[in-house]
């Protein structure tokens, strides 16, 4: 399996869309993917990820399938410490303030992360991958090439 994880183009967070720059980035990415084999295209349910995926899907004549578990979580912006399955400890004090929306309403971290992990595990299992500790390993052969258009808040969480 070859997995392309793509963060959306330059965002207009207030309208859950892309700026003019973000639209140009999405078009440039579609041109880059023109000569790259893709078997499936997925995106978060949020507009900015779907708008980034749309030009690539149009160039390829493909459908964009929605993956709800890839929606952006703002949990990573709250202060936390966590230890992963392979022994690393991460501490973030005050989160990443650049993206705060001012609402102060952050999800309960463990529940959101559990949903993302479960969704990721189920998704990747469909392509012959299995989580063992903090690492995914192949338990079968899969030649698929898959693009997932999502968010920094998905990858950071």
Question: Locations of the language-model features?
Answer:
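Aromatic-acidic/polar surface patches that form glycan- and anion
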Residues: 18, 45, 109, 113, ...
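Active-site-adjacent alpha-helix immediately C-terminal to a catalytic or transition-state-stabilizing loop
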Residues: 124-157
């Amino acid at each position: 399996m070859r997995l392309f994880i793509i963060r959306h183009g330059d965002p207009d967070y207030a309208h859950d869309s892309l700026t003019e720059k973000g639209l140009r980035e999405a078009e440039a990415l579609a041109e880059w993917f023109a000569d790259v084999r893709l078997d499936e295209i997925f995106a978060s349910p949020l507009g900015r990820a779907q708008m980034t995926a749309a030009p690539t899907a149009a160039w390829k004549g493909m459908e964009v399938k929605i993956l709800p578990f890839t929606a952006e979580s703002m949990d990573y912006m709250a202060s936390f410490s966590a230890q992963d399955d392979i022994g690393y400890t991460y501490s973030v004090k005050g989160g990443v303030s650049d993206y705060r929306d001012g609402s102060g309403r952050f999800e309960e971290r463990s529940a959101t992360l559990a949903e993302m992990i479960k969704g990721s595990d189920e998704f990747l299992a469909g392509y012959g991958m299995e989580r063992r500790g903090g690492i995914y390993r192949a338990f079968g052969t899969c030649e698929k090439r898959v693009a997932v258009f999502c968010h920094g808040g998905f990858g950071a969480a």
